[in-house]
Amino acid sequence: MNHKTILVTGASRGIGKAIALTYAKNGWDVVITCLRREEELKKTQREIEALGVSCLAWMGDAGDFESCSRLFDAIRERFGSLDVLVNNAGISYIGLFQDMTPDEWNHILNTNLTSVFNCCRLAVPMMVSHKSGRILNISSVWGVCGASCEVAYSATKGGINAMTRALAKELAPSSIQVNAIACGAIDTEMNQFLDEEERNALLEEIPAGRMGRAEEVGKLAYQLGSEDSYLTGQIIQLDGGWI
């Protein structure tokens, strides 16, 4: 059986892991990446391989182009090509903008936005050559409306949204769809800093009355990446009606 192949960046846990497992459960070979959490990445790899598909786990910096180039060399060698790219790698910075250092700004920009450029730049020629492919960028509602004390994070997600729309237009003639999921409050480790009072206040703002689950992002990501569709260039908000 010729399995299709997906690359998910930032897949050691949370949303990235949920997306990777969803595709694996549907018979896809999976490439997963992480920068620092090697043991968690290996655990995810074992879970994926237990589903009967092949999994390449790669430790490296998606924000570094040369590092990404080595990753894509490994993908070509092992799988031949790539059918779906999910740009999920990301970090947050919470604090006053006036206290942010240039190094902190550059770090979040490289991790959240430059990584998307790097992976898209390397994946697009592969997809164009086959006149087929899907690119899915994991964004945030803060990229739509902005968030106080998360200026840099909001800026990177807004950049991802703009890049999604522009790249979708450029790649549509090659039958490649590019979309983004703008997540609201998803119940992952990234939101574990909230204390009980803050969490309850947040839930009161969400019409659905709860935070989203990583598995729900995985389900939507699978639908967008696995089905033939006229849908491209869209920023799909998955936020329980919050924003």
Which sequence ranges carry the predicted segments?
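Conserved glycine-rich cofactor-binding loop
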Residues: 12-13
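Conserved glycine-rich Rossmann-like NAD(P)H-binding loop of the short-chain dehydrogenase/reductase
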Residues: 26-43
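Residue(s) in the substrate-gating loop at a strand-loop-helix junction
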Residues: 140
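Active-site helix of classical SDR
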Residues: 120, 156, 164
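Alpha-helical segment proximal to the catalytic Tyr-Lys
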Residues: 125, 169-173
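C-terminal substrate-recognition "lid" of short-chain dehydrogenase/reductases
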Residues: 132, 176, 210-238
